[in-house]
A protein has these predicted regions:
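Vicinal oxygen chelate
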Residues: 1-2, 46, 90-128
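Exposed loop/turn and edge beta-strand positions of beta-sandwich/beta-sheet ligand-binding modules
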Residues: 5, 41-43, 75, 110
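N-terminal beta-strand motif that seeds the catalytic metal site of vicinal oxygen chelate
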Residues: 1-18, 76-81
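A short, acidic/glycine-rich surface segment
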Residues: 32-34, 40-42, 62-67, 102
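Core segments of cupin and vicinal oxygen chelate
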Residues: 11-53
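Mid-chain, well-packed structural core segment of small domains
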Residues: 69-86
Length: 128
């Protein structure tokens, strides 16, 4: 079996305005579509940056996932974005009021990294 690439990553958010602002206005993704689905009580929109597509479901009644700092639950741990300069990203996060952890060094590859969080507390990572 051959997989060519990751097609998309699906995320569930609870608040349309906050989630859209975070991914589109703050992180710079382009919104490519939007579907209001009353029968499922949600809104689905896709955002894209380069080859990365995030499929975002807004479900106001979805239960919240366990909070950090304990990410050790079964399932997706976090989503990591490769960046050229983690420190510059952290400065931008401060300017944009994006909650993040401190700069640290990856134990395995020795590169700079840091975790940050979307409006619902989903752990995300930037990594050089």
């Amino acid at each position: 079996m051959k997989f060519d690439a990751v097609h998309h990553i699906a995320i569930i958010g609870s608040d349309y305005d906050k989630t859209r602002e975070f991914y589109v206005e703050k992180l710079g993704f382009e919104q490519v579509d939007e579907h209001i689905r009353p029968e499922k009580n949600d809104i689905l929109f896709n955002v894209k940056k380069g080859n990365l597509v995030l499929e975002i479901f807004i479900k106001p009644d979805a239960p919240m996932r366990p909070v950090m700092p304990n990410p050790e639950h079964t399932g997706l741990r976090h989503l990591a974005f490769q960046v050229a300069d983690v420190e510059a990203c952290l400065e931008e996060f401060d300017r944009l009021d994006i909650r993040h952890e401190v700069l640290r060094t990856d134990d395995f590859d020795g590169k700079k990294m840091a975790f940050f969080f979307d409006p619902d507390g989903l752990p995300l990572e930037i990594h050089e």
